Swiss-Prot record:
Binds 1 zinc ion per subunit. The zinc ion is necessary for the toxin interaction with MHC class II. Its cofactor is Zn(2+). The keyword Ligase does not apply. Keywords: Disulfide bond, Enterotoxin, Metal-binding, Secreted, Signal, Superantigen, Toxin, Virulence, Zinc. GO terms for molecular function: metal ion binding; toxin activity. One of its GO terms (cellular component) is extracellular region. PROSITE patterns: STAPH_STREP_TOXIN_1, STAPH_STREP_TOXIN_2. Belongs to the staphylococcal/streptococcal toxin family. Disulfide bonds join C120-C130. This is Enterotoxin type A. Zn(2+) binds at H211, H249, D251. Pfam families: Stap_Strp_tox_C, Stap_Strp_toxin. The lineage of its organism: Bacteria, Bacillati, Bacillota, Bacilli, Bacillales. Monomer. Interacts with MHC class II molecules alpha/HLA-DRB1 and beta/HLA-DRA chains. The interaction with MHC-II molecules occurs at both zinc-dependent and zinc-independent sites. Interacts with T-cell receptor beta variable 7-9/TRBV7-9.
């Protein structure tokens, strides 16, 4: 009897260890499937620019930076951020409020985000790139080992396996932007998320949800971006939303109709 119980417990433990799935529901509680915006509703060049942002463009990634400089009270200007860029020298980070700025100005920070130059307002003209959020404190924010974030993905209600290496971070508190940029790059590579219909862009609607065990979930409509260019498409990250990475997972819902 004891031997049987031991074998059963061992089987359960192995199942938990090897399973690629995590707790998730087939329907998101935050946004109803029918409320999701359709790809066809995006304005003008928005679809192509979203593909450029999430798949092709380089990201601003660095650690242990510090700056007291500003352009406006809700910004932090990192002079000399780019060392080998063809066009830009400085990076201007824009936030929702001065309160967010006060948390990071003059402190050692790490940056990870999507930046843009066209319609970047502030800093030295043609030498400054802009970014929304993407900032975390550097000190006491390191995990003992890299966190690989589990992902549940449903395509038209059918669950698909996502490699565990897809989204990862070494931060305890990480911006949602950092995780979202990695997840959407995978979605573009695997599912042609931001391709037009004629270029095999079968996904028409989508939702990504970031779940933690201690905080409210954060979600984005994958085709809910406003405007056509990066200065508006990326504004969803202006709140610099951060979450605890240690006990979290991501749920993604994709629909082809």
């Amino acid at each position: 009897m004891k031997k049987t119980a031991f074998i059963l417990l061992l089987f359960i433990a192995l199942t938990w260890t090897t399973s690629p799935l995590v707790n998730g529901s087939e329907k998101s509680e935050e946004i109803n499937e029918k409320d999701l915006r359709k790809k066809s509703e995006l304005q003008g060049a928005a679809l192509g620019n979203l593909k450029q942002i999430y798949y092709y463009n380089e990201k601003a990634k660095t650690e242990n930076k510090e700056s007291h400089d500003q352009f406006l009270q809700h910004t932090i200007l990192f002079k000399g951020f780019f060392t080998n860029h063809s066009w830009y020298n400085d990076l201007l980070v824009d936030f929702d409020s001065k309160d967010i700025v006060d948390k990071y100005k003059g402190k050692k920070v790490d940056l990870y985000g999507a930046y843009y130059g066209y319609q970047c307002a502030g800093g030295t003209p043609n030498k400054t790139a802009c970014m929304y959020g993407g900032v975390t404190l550097h000190d006491n924010n390191r995990l003992t080992e890299e966190k690989k974030v589990p992902i549940n993905l449903w395509l038209d209600g059918k669950q698909n396996t996502v490699p565990l290496e897809t989204v990862k971070t070494n931060k305890k508190n990480v911006t949602v932007q950092e995780l979202d940029l990695q997840a959407r790059r995978y979605l573009q590579e695997k599912y042609n998320l931001y391709n037009s219909d004629v270029f095999d862009g079968k996904v028409q609607r989508g939702l990504i949800v970031f779940h933690t065990s201690t905080e409210p979930s954060v979600n984005y409509d994958l085709f809910g971006a406003q405007g056509q260019n990066s200065n508006t498409l990326l504004r969803i990250y202006r709140d610099n939303k951060t979450i605890n990475s240690e006990n979290m997972h991501i749920d993604i819902y994709l629909y082809t109709s």
